[in-house]
From Swiss-Prot:
Membrane topology: Lipid-anchor
Role of this protein: Guanine nucleotide-binding proteins (G proteins) are involved as a modulator or transducer in various transmembrane signaling systems. The beta and gamma chains are required for the GTPase activity, for replacement of GDP by GTP, and for G protein-effector interaction.
Biological classification of the source: Eukaryota, Metazoa, Chordata, Craniata, Vertebrata
Annotated compartments: Cell membrane
UniProt keyword terms in alphabetical order: Cell membrane, Lipoprotein, Membrane, Methylation, Prenylation, Transducer
Organism, as annotated: Canis lupus familiaris
One example of a Gene Ontology biological process annotation: G protein-coupled receptor signaling pathway
Protein name: Guanine nucleotide-binding protein G(I)/G(S)/G(O) subunit gamma-T2
Cysteine methyl ester: residues carrying this PTM: 66
Gene this chain is encoded by: GNGT2
Bias (Basic and acidic residues) ranges: 53-69
Lipidation (S-farnesyl cysteine): 66
Length: 69
């Protein structure tokens, strides 16, 4: 699709995207980094990658063997 558009059209699209992005609120990383760290530490107990999945609730556990007769 990008090959079908002229350079002028591509630049217009880029300007429109930048106009949308400039409206996004910005925050200092010193503040947001701490908030993210606190959130991750608070939710670590609920993370199945950290604490594992109980065998009875594991959807990927093999249900049974394969029988060939």
């Amino acid at each position: 699709m990008a090959q079908e558009l002229s350079e002028k059209e591509l630049l217009k699209m880029e300007v429109e995207q930048l106009k949308k992005e400039v409206k996004n609120p910005r925050a200092l990383i010193s503040k947001t980094g701490k908030e993210i760290k606190d959130y991750v530490e608070a939710e670590a107990g609920n993370d199945p990658l950290l604490k594992g999945i109980p065998e009875d609730k594991n959807p990927f556990k093999e249900k049974g063997g394969c029988m060939i007769s």
